[in-house]
Amino acid sequence: MSKQKNDTFLRACRGEKTDYVPVWYMRQAGRSQPEYRALKEKYSLFEITHQPELCAYVTRLPVEQYHVDAAILYKDIMSPLPAIGVDVEIKAGVGPVIANPIRSLADVEKLGEIHPEEDVPYVLETIKLLTTEQLNVPLIGFAGAPFTLASYMIEGGPSKNYNKTKAFMYAEPKAWFALMDKLADMTIRYVKAQIRAGASAIQIFDSWVGAVNVDDYRTFIKPTMARIFAALREENVPLIMFGVGASHLAKEWNDLPLDVIGLDWRLSIREARERGITKALQGNLDPAVLLAPWEVIEKRVKQILDEGMEQPGYIFNLGHGIFPEIQPETLKRLTAFIHDYTSRK
């Protein structure tokens, strides 16, 4: 039986009133904690995620240290790709590198299917361990969105402009949509398995979708996202969408059958609502602010919280993931401040 007690995050996802604003941080598991850095001297990311006890420990750390209102599973958006035949390596200082980039419809057709219980049992075991024994807050499962995964698979690694990805999308639409379908099927199976193992909410990360304009999003990406969220909706857990530099797509996300839209710092909470966004909102402090003096942090955070609390259905987060230079003590202090400031309003 789950020991989960604090459901403030889940209630905010559903647009309900809460006693205070819940908070969690993207990339809170790992990154800046000294305990995590010590582990990374011994193990790679994939080695940690393949060991449920170790992975659960890393996932649990920020809940215990920062007192956040939700945990997010420690893993990478690339984690399910080897199961469908993608040779991926996370290289230090570079990021994911793909040995066999997609170049044609034939390459797409070679991709297999994921069977989560057989291909990623360690992910499901970690979730079960956390949700039945260790956490008193909800656990967020997650996956990468097809566009972002496809961009790595086509570019062969990180990119600054996604030229190869967009060229493939424009020049090879049949292959593009075949790839979207393969990745959508993988995402649906992978995420449903996480939910059935015990994840209480799901976030879909479309990290690089800001590279496309609205028309291209509607044509080449949105139908796939609609299919994914419609399938996940059957599991009856809150669904969150997040992308970087993608404020121009927020209205498109608002059409999808999801619960929460995560914003980066380029679009304010108030402006999002003025644009007609009706979903619950999550965000959106620029993580770079956390390197500034506390008085600067507090001023920026108050402004975001004041806007967020204008309506129910708000979760505080960063506008992107924590980076290693951010001090754990800053995050602990920030969480306490958010809880205190919003519980007095």
UniProtKB/Swiss-Prot annotation:
Superkingdom to which the source organism belongs: Bacteria
EC number: 4.1.1.37
Pathway: Porphyrin-containing compound metabolism; protoporphyrin-IX biosynthesis; coproporphyrinogen-III from 5-aminolevulinate: step 4/4
Annotated Pfam families: URO-D (PF01208)
Gene3D superfamilies: 3.20.20.210
UniProt GO MF annotations: uroporphyrinogen decarboxylase activity
Site feature location: Transition state stabilizer: D76
Reaction(s) catalysed by this chain's protein: uroporphyrinogen III + 4 H(+) = coproporphyrinogen III + 4 CO2
Main location: cytoplasm
GO BP field: protoporphyrinogen IX biosynthetic process
InterPro entries linked to this entry: UROD/MetE-like_sf, Uroporphyrinogen_deCO2ase_HemE, Uroporphyrinogen_deCOase
Any GO CC annotation of this UniProt entry: cytosol
Record key words, sorted: Cytoplasm, Decarboxylase, Lyase, Porphyrin biosynthesis
Broadest EC class assigned to this enzyme: lyase
Assembly and oligomerization: Homodimer.
Name recorded for this polypeptide: Uroporphyrinogen decarboxylase
